[in-house]
Amino acid sequence: MTITLDARALMIESIEQGLADGSLEIGAAVRRLRTEVTGLHQSQFAKMCKISVRTLVHIEQGEGNQTLKSLNAVFRPFGMKMGVVKVRRSL
């Protein structure tokens, strides 16, 4: 699978926006990044990120209590990392 750099950037931006506005959960975001942006299988992507396939599966399925280190490992190839954002309260 080959995509242009512009298309790749737009996909990543769309996923970032989904995470920011809460319409996309972390697991779904990781799965979309892996499949749509890299086109890698879970075993290939896990190896690239230096995590176990089991950890990647748990992240993508939203299971368990993942470490910040593992989450950052899967976001790093896309220029992202976990962070803290202010919650907007409606008045």
Predicted regions and their residues:
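Short alpha-helical DNA-recognition segment
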Residues: 39-57
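DNA major-groove recognition helix of helix-turn-helix/homeodomain DNA-binding modules
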Residues: 67-85
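Short amphipathic helical patch at the helix-1/turn junction of helix-turn-helix
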Residues: 24, 35-36
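N-terminal flexible/basic segments that precede or flank functional cores
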Residues: 1-28, 89-91
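Residues within the helices of the helix-turn-helix
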Residues: 31-32, 43
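Residue-level signal for the short linker/turn that defines the boundary of a DNA-recognition helix
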Residues: 28, 38-41, 66
